[in-house]
Amino acid sequence: MIIITAITLIFSMLISQDCSPGYTEVNELCFHDGDLSVIQKMIDNSYVSNIDLGCEDWDNYCGSPNPYMDDQDSWFWVTVDSVYYEWAGNNNGIVEPLELGIQEWNNGRLTSLMCGAYIYCQLSGPIPEEINQLTEATTIRLEYNYLSGFVPETLCDLEINENDYLQFDLGGNRLCPPYPSCSGEGGDFWYQDTSACTEISDVNFDYSTNILDIILLVSFVVEETYPDYQQTIASDINSDGNLDVLDIVEIVNVILEVD
């Protein structure tokens, strides 16, 4: 019995996967840390958004992200180097990166993330600015989730055909204008629910432009505090790519016109 156990241990060590630096081993497979971190950010943004989907206690599919993806009976899968793996959840109560949607990986890099219609990832919150780290991705489908906020310009760093909705689709979310040129705006299937979007100049996102926005904008201009991407877009009143005194003048004019 001891000999059999020893042989099994040695065999396991021989076939185990040694991942290169910058990669994480999961189930003896290697996954790029940067790609995993972007998916994790999507999940984190969804949890932090606290979106109200009107969930009932009995509904195991309701939540953002979809809690069913963490269920051991979930039907989602991951393809790694053309090999199909049924990737059931681990039932720990938290959706983890490799449990989200339908994914394809090649040589440790994410090449496809399917999280759109009929997959029901139910993502919410903003698209991570770090999405440009998915440098090997050729398919990103995020249509008909609950994504909100401004679309990061970094999305345009990716080599994805935004005109092919089978490769890339952001439609049917709650994303706010202005949209970058690579967003797919103007396509046949483009639609966004902008009813909850605030105006550029609403720096603190309280649905009103007032003295509080000026105070926050000044703190950005003098570098007392540093804006995140969403705040940067809302603060660049004149859309010149800089936060400076000209934006302060513009926001004052906005307030005076409102009054």
Provide a role label for each language-model segment.
Residues E130, F150, T154-L155:
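C-terminal per-repeat helix/turn "cap" of leucine-rich repeat
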Residues S195-D259:
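Cellulosome-associated attachment modules in secreted, modular CAZymes
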Residues Q122, I131-I140:
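Extracellular repeat-rich scaffold modules on cell surfaces
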Residues I2-S16:
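Sec-dependent N-terminal signal peptides
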Residues L14-Q122, I127, E159, G172-S201, ...:
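N-terminal capping/linker segments that flank leucine-rich repeat
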Residues G34-K41, P126, F150, D213-L216, ...:
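Extracytoplasmic/secreted proteins, especially bacterial periplasmic and envelope-associated proteins
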Residues T111-G116, T138-L142, L166-L170:
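Conserved hydrophobic beta-strand positions in leucine-rich repeat
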Residues G108, N132-T135, C156-N163:
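Inter-repeat linker/turn residues at the boundaries of leucine-rich repeats
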